[in-house]
């Protein structure tokens, strides 16, 4: 076998790939022959090259142009040399006067004038700008020994504090009592006059006792009506009587005021004073009760403006009554101070014997619908609101105070519970999708099915709107989209099949 194999190796071609099937690509195959048309013949290239004649006209023109340029340069040099010789002859004849004139003309001729330079850099040479220079020891000693010399143009008075015109204004303090007296002249009754003149001596001891009683009653009202801070940052004023229940389960009774007068449509400037030393109250805003008191008379009480500095810096006070009146079936929404721009309508009603059924109210001006929470639009929502626990009602009040309606908040609370953050996220997403033009019912379906993916919610809403326009039922559309994971083609086929089957 070995000899036979060797013999084949030496005496003939032998391939190990014989009888082995394999496939060769098209690019390795021999290309097909191309048939030339009849009578086609290639010209003889050598003959064509021999017959070609080149005239070298461009090269000859380039040589001529170079010769012309050289002749022009030689003529210019010859003219310059002749002019220099003529100037030298004139200088030798004129003597030193001619030399000075020529030198002056040379230095001041526009051709030889140096270009303009910045005066700051005029004394510097460009090569020596970055070259370090040694400081002479004598100059150093002189600097050390000699006192610092002030320049003539330096005046220390320029840097001293000049008289500020606002300093005089700060020294002029405002007499708060006098300002209030000027504002309330002709509109206030005995109570404000007694309050403002409480520090002045009285001859009658009975009037002094009456002043002290008035001040004590107002201070008690200040303490009783101090805002109650909620954990969520809102402040709600306490309620009056037993016809309204407070959100924090506390009731306040106001001591009777002997004489009260009518104060209407007053706006007061902001007066800065120390609360510890001043007993003057600033009348800033009012609140009213929409339910009647036990005696049948309606009172609008003055709200003291003494607040803690931290609360003033916060700026997010909420003024108003509790959000729900369960006994009388009426609702008084809480209003934030930011929602009442420059509103200082003060109304103090005198005690009158009016029927219990009639109760006058004070309506604030310039309130928009978005600023004041509205009543539940349907009786079912109102019944649901009454059935809530105190904590759930407190949660609803908090979200409603932010501007949402009771219906939306109750629906969101059913889906998200009492977590305010989740309720706000749900309401925000719902509002955004509704603003884009989608049906609120479809938006609720999308939020229920795809809570975490905004992209899937948008796709789901677009497909639902499209299939709804085609005439399919919402129930079938929802089932099909949920089954096929928002696949439009498969969902459409399934809907068509269901429509044909029905």
Curated annotation (Swiss-Prot):
Coiled coil: none annotated. Keywords: Cytoplasm, Endosome, Phosphoprotein, Protein transport, Repeat, Transport. Residues 389-430, 451-498 form the UBA domain. It holds the Pfam family UBAP-1_UBA2. GO terms for molecular function: ubiquitin binding. Residues 260-290 are annotated as: Interaction with PTPN23. The keyword Phosphoprotein applies. The modification Phosphoserine is found at residues 146, 205, 289. Its main location: cytoplasm. It is found in: Cytoplasm, Cytosol; Endosome. Residues 77-120, 135-156 are annotated as: Disordered. GO terms for cellular component: cytosol; ESCRT I complex; plasma membrane. One of its GO terms (biological process) is ubiquitin-dependent protein catabolic process via the multivesicular body sorting pathway. Residues 17-63 form the UMA domain. Component of an ESCRT-I complex (endosomal sorting complex required for transport I) which consists of TSG101, VPS28, VPS37A and UBAP1 in a 1:1:1:1 stoichiometry. Interacts with PTPN23. Interacts (via UBA domains) with ubiquitinated proteins. Component of the ESCRT-I complex, a regulator of vesicular trafficking process. Binds to ubiquitinated cargo proteins and is required for the sorting of endocytic ubiquitinated cargos into multivesicular bodies (MVBs). Plays a role in the proteasomal degradation of ubiquitinated cell-surface proteins, such as EGFR and BST2. The UMA domain mediates association with the ESCRT-I complex. This is Ubiquitin-associated protein 1. It comes from Rattus norvegicus (Rat).
């Amino acid at each position: 076998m070995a000899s036979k194999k060797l013999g084949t190796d030496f005496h003939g071609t032998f391939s190990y790939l014989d009888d082995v099937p394999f496939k060769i690509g098209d690019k390795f195959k021999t290309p097909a022959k191309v048939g030339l048309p009849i009578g086609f013949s290639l010209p003889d290239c050598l003959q064509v090259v021999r017959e070609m004649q080149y005239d070298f006209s461009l090269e000859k023109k380039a040589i001529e142009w170079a010769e012309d340029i050289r002749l022009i340069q030689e003529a210019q040099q010859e003219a310059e040399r002749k002019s220099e010789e003529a100037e030298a002859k004139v200088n030798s004849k004129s003597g030193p006067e001619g030399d000075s004139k020529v030198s002056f003309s040379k230095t001041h001729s526009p051709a030889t004038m140096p270009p303009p330079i910045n005066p700051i850099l005029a004394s510097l040479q460009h090569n020596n700008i970055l070259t370090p220079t040694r400081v002479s020891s004598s100059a150093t000693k002189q600097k050390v020994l000699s006192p610092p010399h002030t320049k003539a143009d330096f005046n220390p008075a320029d840097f001293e504090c000049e008289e500020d015109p606002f300093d005089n204004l700060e020294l002029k303090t405002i007499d708060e009592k006098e300002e209030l007296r000027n504002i309330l002249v002709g509109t206030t009754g005995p109570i404000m006059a007694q309050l403002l003149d409480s520090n002045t001596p009285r001859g009658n001891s009975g009037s002094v006792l009456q002043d002290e009683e008035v001040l004590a009653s107002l201070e008690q009202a200040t303490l009783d009506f101090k805002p109650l801070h909620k954990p969520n940052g809102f402040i709600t004023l306490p309620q009056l009587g037993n016809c309204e229940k407070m959100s924090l389960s506390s009731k306040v009774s106001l001591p009777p005021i002997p004489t009260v007068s009518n104060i209407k449509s007053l706006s007061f400037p902001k007066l800065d004073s120390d609360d510890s030393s001043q007993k003057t109250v600033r009348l800033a805003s009012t609140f009213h009760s929409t339910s009647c008191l036990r005696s049948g008379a309606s009172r609008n009480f003055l709200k003291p403006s003494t607040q803690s500095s931290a609360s003033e810096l916060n700026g997010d006070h909420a003024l108003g009554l509790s959000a729900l009146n369960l006994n009388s079936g009426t609702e008084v929404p809480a209003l934030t101070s930011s929602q009442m721009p420059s509103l200082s309508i003060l109304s103090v009603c005198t005690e009158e014997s009016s029927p219990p059924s009639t109760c006058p109210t004070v309506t604030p001006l310039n309130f928009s619908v978005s600023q004041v929470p509205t009543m539940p639009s349907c009786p079912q929502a109102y019944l649901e609101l009454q059935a809530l626990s105190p904590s759930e009602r407190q949660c609803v009040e908090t979200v409603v105070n932010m501007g949402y309606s009771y219906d939306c908040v109750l629906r969101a609370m059913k889906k998200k519970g009492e977590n305010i953050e989740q309720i706000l996220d749900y309401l925000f997403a719902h509002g955004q999708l509704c603003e884009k033009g989608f049906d609120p019912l479809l938006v609720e379906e999308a939020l229920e099915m795809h809570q975490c993916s905004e992209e899937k919610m948008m796709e789901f809403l677009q497909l639902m709107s499209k299939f709804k326009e085609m005439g399919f039922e919402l129930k079938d559309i929802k089932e099909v989209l949920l089954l096929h994971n928002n696949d439009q083609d498969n969902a459409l086929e399934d809907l068509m099949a269901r429509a044909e089957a029905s």
